[in-house]
Amino acid sequence: MGELPLDINIQEPRWDQRTFLGRARHFFTVTDPRNLLLSGAQLEASRNIVQNYRAGIVTPGLTEDQLWRAKYVYDSAFHPDTGEKVVLIGRMSAQVPMNMTITGCMLIFYRKTPTVVFWQWLNQSFNAVVNYSNRSGDAPITVRQLGMAYVSATTGAVATALGLKSLTKHLPPLVGRFVPFAAVAAANCINIPLMRQRELQVGIPVTNEQGQRLGHSVAAAKKGIFQVVISRICMAIPAMAIPPVIMDTLEKKDFLKRRPWLGAPLQMGLVGFCLVFATPLCCALFPQRSSIHVSRLEPELRAQIQEQNPSIEVVYYNKGL
């Protein structure tokens, strides 16, 4: 076997990101919870393999599959811009187990006001850690912006949950089970735009097909943020809509009536099962490198592009996660 060539592009995902299947395979790998079990030594070994390869040094005996594995392990634990190790619960691989626990508890403890407030607060605290850990190096989040988004999203989630909780008192019990989902959806609509408010003020970079930067666009930022909000809400739908329906049916059966202690672990398991698939599949709904027609850009930027590159009809931007 010959030495591994140096022309493998590990700056990009392994699979074609222009197709939904390629994006789904990428995010199934990125969100794999098993990466959380890797030791510090294994993470450092993967970092060394990746950094050496980028520097033109191939680890002896390294195969292409091992290189890609090291790349995804490295990406799962280290910030792409700063190179710092991301705190454990802020990693993409922590999304499924952390959301399983928090979402499961939101669905279990939805009846009493103190528990509703606590779990909505904890969910937004976790979101703040994830957003800060995965902040962009191109448009960094300040502590003030983080705090404003955190307080606003928590207030919005709690207000929505408590408001709907009072409205559903006289409705069938099943309706009350969907209150946590409505609160999470409302919080996403508040949290993500606030977290990315700088992008809404100054725009995000747009490029041509070759990746050459053409300017900054607020229109592209709005489209990217909208796509992320939709993805996040869709991500929550299976885990917060399917288990309540199943549990409402099962709780009327003798099996659970005789074994009420099974309700909580069963609901948690259903949430986890939904999230294992919903998280990567909903991350893959829109391409990470999305496109927008030049005609939808700001007049100044559109005129600048048409003057310098009249043949360009579509530009590209990173939508974020």
Swiss-Prot record:
Catalytic activity: L-serine(in) = L-serine(out)
Phosphoprotein listed as a keyword: no
GO biological process terms held by the UniProt record: mitochondrial transmembrane transport; one-carbon metabolic process; serine import into mitochondrion
Any one Gene Ontology molecular-function term assigned to this protein's record: monoatomic ion transmembrane transporter activity
Residues bearing PTM N-acetylmethionine: 1
InterPro entries: Mtc
GO cellular component terms, semicolon-separated: mitochondrial inner membrane; mitochondrion
Topological relation to the membrane, as annotated: Multi-pass membrane protein
Keyword list, A-Z: Acetylation, Amino-acid transport, Membrane, Mitochondrion, One-carbon metabolism, Transmembrane, Transmembrane helix, Transport
Transmembrane portions of the chain: 146-164, 174-194, 226-246, 266-286
The keyword Ligase is annotated on this UniProt entry: no
Compartments, as annotated in UniProt: Mitochondrion membrane
Main localization (coarse): mitochondrion
Described function: Mitochondrial serine transporter that mediates transport of serine into mitochondria, an important step of the one-carbon metabolism pathway. Mitochondrial serine is converted to glycine and formate, which then exits to the cytosol where it is used to generate the charged folates that serve as one-carbon donors.
Family in the record: Belongs to the sideroflexin family.
Protein's UniProt name: Sideroflexin-3
UniProt organism field: Bos taurus
